UniProtKB/Swiss-Prot annotation:
Homodimer. Belongs to the NAD(P)-dependent epimerase/dehydratase family. Fucose synthase subfamily. NADP(+) binds at G14, G15, S16, G17, L18, V19, G20, K147, P170, T171, N172, V173, H186. The lineage of its organism: Eukaryota, Metazoa, Chordata, Craniata, Vertebrata. This is GDP-L-fucose synthase. It catalyses: GDP-beta-L-fucose + NADP(+) = GDP-4-dehydro-alpha-D-rhamnose + NADPH + H(+). It comes from Cricetulus griseus (Chinese hamster). Catalyzes the two-step NADP-dependent conversion of GDP-4-dehydro-6-deoxy-D-mannose to GDP-fucose, involving an epimerase and a reductase reaction. The gene is GFUS.
Length: 321
């Protein structure tokens, strides 16, 4: 059972990003409970790399619960270039948020990690016990170590103060309100933008890399529903992987084909193998999640891709790109 319900003020950092917008939608569509007040904030409300601004935000909101999504993020090529920036900014953000939550007496914090935190050299499938078993992939070590430190801090806050600070580890998230920037975005939104442009220009589609790497994609609206479950019901300090099953892993080539199909693209598709593939796979086990929620139903991948492509086309002018 989760902790007792009652009046709650839930602060969501990174509230205007991909996952924050998905949680907003799911709450607005009926997932919110009586007695819950949801407060979504973005970098416009406070610079969370600044301790004083973060403290002021927490003093003002006085959250009983926090979903911590705010982070400096970017795709593979941006990470390779700016490892120091990713390390410093994220360490500052995370320390400021967790300590401000502690100072105002927040009852529970759920932070968002990433599967890139896992050791580069590992056995598959990855599970929650393996986080600290070796160094992460060298391409984005700054971001990965900063995210790992959230787990270290959560354990320390529990050991020293008894705080219920925990974290979730989603696999590759995609959906409406993603960053569709081709240079800086993640693989699926980048593909969606590329297909849109190729279709508009009547040109060929070039996919970066060989198309062979495999990923577990999770639709942002499914992840939002799981985040709300974690907030209410999951009381371990140890993190939990939020992912589709291993059998639902798809190759980048298959992902590209799903986007091509969803957008009715009829042009030529080529793969540029001179571009880096990143990690070949990072298959994660969702065994722990399934032990808690054996009947949770994920949106089928092709349907989720179709909905995301439709959102991007309908909101092309406003979309982050």
């Amino acid at each position: 059972m989760g902790e007792p319900q009652g009046s709650r003020r839930i602060l969501v950092t990174g509230g205007s990003g991909l996952v924050g917008r998905a949680i907003q939608k799911v709450v607005a569509d009926g997932a919110g409970l009586p007695g819950e007040e949801w407060v979504f904030v973005s970098s416009k409300d406070a610079d969370l790399t600044d301790a004083a601004q973060t403290q002021a935000l927490f003093q003002k909101v006085q959250p009983t619960h926090v979903i911590h999504l705010a982070a400096m993020v970017g795709g593979l090529f941006r990470n390779i270039k700016y490892n120091l920036d990713f390390w410093r900014k994220n360490v500052h953000i995370n320390d400021n948020v967790l300590h401000s939550a502690f100072e105002v007496g927040t009852r529970k914090v759920v932070s968002c990690l990433s599967t890139c935190i896992f050791p580069d050299k590992t056995t598959y499938p990855i599970d929650e016990t393996m986080i600290h078993n070796g160094p992460p992939h060298s391409s984005n070590f700054g971001y990965s170590y900063a995210k790992r430190m959230i787990d270290v801090q959560n354990r320390a806050y529990f050991q020293q103060h008894g705080c219920t600070f925990t974290a979730v580890i989603p696999t590759n998230v995609f959906g409406p309100h993603d960053n569709f920037n081709i240079e800086d975005g993640h693989v699926l939104p980048g593909l969606i933008h590329k297909v849109h442009l190729a279709k508009s220009n009547g040109s060929a589609l070039t996919v970066w890399g060989t198309g062979k790497p495999r990923r577990q994609f999770i639709y942002s609206l499914d992840l939002a529903r799981l985040f709300i479950w974690v907030l209410r019901e999951y009381n371990e300090v140890e993190p939990i992987i939020l992912s589709v099953g291993e059998e639902d892993e798809v190759s980048i080539k298959e992902a590209a084909e799903a986007v091509v199909e969803a957008m009715d693209f009829c042009g030529e598709v080529t793969f540029d193998s001179t571009k880096s593939d990143g990690q070949y796979k990072k298959t994660a086990s969702n065994g722990k999640l399934r032990a808690y929620l054996p009947d949770f139903r994920f949106t089928p991948f092709k349907q989720a891709v179709k909905e995301t492509c439709a959102w991007f086309t309908d909101n092309y002018e406003q979309a982050r790109k």
